[in-house]
């Protein structure tokens, strides 16, 4: 398996609850190298653009409001099989269904406030990384 990259965000709920350090520790302990990292806040327009794929879904408005209500931590991670391995590390969207030892089992409070985002494909990882990090911010 080739080394590749994935994108993650620590969402506003986890940031507000003081879980940044613990989540980053789980990520690095999971064998991921953090190659880009920043604390930022999405505007409503940013959140709408980032989640445009969900625009027709009934939860879209709540998602946009949630993701723009406070700071997030955006990161690009590197590891062999990065996308799939990170999806395993974060766990199921519903924290009640997430496996023990996953980020969402430890830090998510609900399906809507599930602590972290992880790219679902190599293609989306590249798109999502470029959305948050200018070329010279990607190392």
UniProtKB/Swiss-Prot annotation:
GO terms for cellular component: cytoplasm
Membership in a protein family: Belongs to the NDK family.
Active site (record annotation): 117
A family per Pfam: NDK
UniProt subunit comment: Homotetramer.
Cofactor(s) needed by this chain: Mg(2+)
Name the UniProt record assigns to this protein: Nucleoside diphosphate kinase
Lineage: Bacteria, Pseudomonadati, Bacteroidota, Flavobacteriia, Flavobacteriales
Binding site for ATP: 11, 59, 87, 93, 104, 114
Organism of this sequence: Flavobacterium johnsoniae (strain ATCC 17061 / DSM 2064 / JCM 8514 / BCRC 14874 / CCUG 350202 / NBRC 14942 / NCIMB 11054 / UW101) (Cytophaga johnsonae)
A GO BP annotation: UTP biosynthetic process
SMART domains given in the database record: NDK
Protein EC: 2.7.4.6
Database matches in SUPFAM superfamilies: Nucleoside diphosphate kinase, NDK
InterPro entries linked: NDK-like_dom (IPR034907), NDK-like_dom_sf (IPR036850), Nucleoside_diP_kinase (IPR001564)
Molecular functions per Gene Ontology: ATP binding; metal ion binding; nucleoside diphosphate kinase activity
Keywords in alphabetical order: ATP-binding, Cytoplasm, Kinase, Magnesium, Metal-binding, Nucleotide metabolism, Nucleotide-binding, Phosphoprotein, Transferase
Described purpose of this protein according to its UniProt entry: Major role in the synthesis of nucleoside triphosphates other than ATP. The ATP gamma phosphate is transferred to the NDP beta phosphate via a ping-pong mechanism, using a phosphorylated active-site intermediate.
EC top class named in words: transferase
């Amino acid at each position: 398996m080739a080394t590749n990259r994935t994108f993650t965000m620590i969402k506003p709920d986890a940031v507000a609850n003081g879980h940044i350090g613990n989540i980053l520790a789980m990520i690095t302990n999971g064998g991921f190298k953090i190659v880009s990292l920043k604390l930022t806040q999405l505007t409503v327009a940013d959140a709408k653009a980032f989640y445009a794929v969900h625009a027709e879904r009934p939860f879209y408005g709540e998602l946009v409001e949630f993701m723009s209500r406070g700071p997030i931590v955006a990161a690009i991670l590197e590891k062999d099989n990065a996308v799939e391995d990170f999806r395993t590390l974060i766990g199921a969207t519903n924290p009640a269904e997430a496996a023990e030892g996953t980020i969402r089992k430890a830090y998510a409070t609900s399906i809507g406030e599930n602590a972290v985002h992880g790219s679902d494909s190599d293609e989306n990882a590249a798109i999502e990384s470029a959305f948050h990090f200018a070329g010279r911010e990607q190392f």
